[in-house]
Structures are given as C-alpha cells and as structure tokens.
Amino acid sequence: MSVSFEKKTKPYSHWEYSNPEFDSSIRIVPERGGLITEWRSEGKELLYFDLDRFLDRDKSVRGGIPILFPICGDLSEGYLSGGKQYFLKQHGFARDLPWSIDLLKDKSGIRLKLSDTNDSRSYFPFFFTLLMDVCLKEKSLQISTKIYNQSKDPMPFSFGLHPYFQVSNTQKIKIDGLPEKCIDQTNMKVTNVSDQIRILDKGVDFLSYPSSSVKLFDSLSRNVIELIHQEPMDTTVIWTDPPRQMVCLEPWTSPRNSMVTGDRKLEIKPEEYIELFTTFKHNSF
C-alpha cells in the first residue's frame, strides 16, 4: 500500500501524511510553527492536543510537538550580538512563524522548512535556513534537523522539541533512564529525580542529562514512549501541566539561558550547518 500526503480541512486545516503499512500517520499545521498536532502509531494516538485552545489564536498551544528555536526556555535579560542587545520570547520564535511543507523525495515522510525574515532579524540578527525531516517508521517517529547559518558571523542557538504525550493518569506513570539528579527549573536548584517523578500530577519542570534513552511507561494504557538521544540533542526536560493528563518528554540541545551562560552553548560557523537527530519509539508492555 502506498503512502498518502494530502491537505484536509477538518477538524482544522492541516496536512496529513500516512503510511498504511505501519498503520501510522501524522498531522501537521505548517502555518502554525510547523506544528505536528497528531502522531498515530499502530492505530493509537500518542500525542496530547488541546484543540479548543489551538483554535484560540490569543492563547499559546498546549499539545502536539512545538519546535523550540533559537532558544530553549527563557532569556529574560536578553543577549549581546555585535555589541547590541536583543531579546527573545520564551522558546524562541520558530513555533510562531509559518513554515513550508513538502513530501520527501523517497516519500518516507515530510520536510518542514523555515528561513529568516526581516522581522526575525530584528531580534535574532542572522540569516538561516532550518530543514526538518519527519519520517514515519514502524513504531517510531524519526526527526532529523539541519540548521544552516547563512550569515557572515557565527550563529549561536539552542534547539529543542516539546512533545506532549497523552497519558491515562499522571499518577500512574513510570520514567526510566534518567539520572539521580536533575535541575528543578522552577527555582534552578539541584534536586532528586525520584522526588520530581512522585509529583508529576502536581506539576513539574525539570532538566536532566541522561546517558541513555529515556522511557515513559503508562501503566494503564500499557503504552511505552522511548526518547532516543543523539549528541548534542541529549538534554531531557520533563514537564507536566495539571490537570492535563499529559507528560512532555522534551529533547533539548542546551539548558535555558545558555546563550548567555555558555553552558552547552552551540554555534554554527558562517556558511556551515549542523544536523540534529531525535527518535521517538512506541511500544506496548
């Protein structure tokens, strides 16, 4: 059976790519930040998506897979570039801009594309192109991202994904693969991962540096989501937003404020690019 790639209007305007061989599909809204709103694997919908909130353009999105660029987290005091101070909103601007979308030549998935604009250069003074290839494989979603610096100066950046995974009950969740310690991003203090996992239903926002993949187990639905990292996109953030029954399992390249602190700060040399890889696997237990 062949794959399909078509534009649809219900329940909202979106593009849908599906692969019947794997009983899998994704929905994408390129004009809303290249947002992947749904990922279905073996017939199961895995992402949390608040449609009512999405339809209210005055509110930020809660759900899908928002794209974080050129920073992850906030940068409250701005940053210096070329002797001038610039300010960026939380998680950057990529999730707010329209992207273009195309079917990959081998039809294994779709390609999203974002380039700088006159407006973006007023707060991020660089010429760039970002290409994100999203491929559906058996029980997995593979995302590879190329970021090109088309400027004459080195381009600092962070990149991340903010996937919302729906769960049956945040009190019935197990997470494996995290280290013992993490940074509580609500107060920027080091704390125990185990203490944070115990209060997922109360709301958490913590960052860690795992040495292997991270697995999210839902004891009621029996779903398992595995985040497979590749350096430098190997920082993991866990975020919950009660009473929503979802857990965000987020791969970042760098912690918040890295453009100022230099902690895991990334730069792309002029006329060069970097390629980043992330895979999400779905299984049952």
Region roles according to the model:
Residues 1-68, 75-78, 212-231, 272-284:
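Beta-strand-rich N-terminal accessory domains
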Residues 1-9, 84-137:
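Extended, loop-rich substrate-binding clefts of extracytoplasmic carbohydrate-active enzymes
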Residues 15, 108-110, 141-143, 214, ...:
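Hydrophobic residues embedded in beta-strands of well-ordered beta-sheets
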Residues 17-19, 29-30, 116-157, 162:
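Acidic, contiguous internal or C-terminal segments within carbohydrate-active enzymes
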Residues 57-113, 210-211, 277:
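An extended acidic
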Residues 154-156, 163-232:
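Active-site/ligand-binding surface loops and adjacent short beta/alpha elements
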Residues 224-285:
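Active-site pocket scaffolds in enzymes
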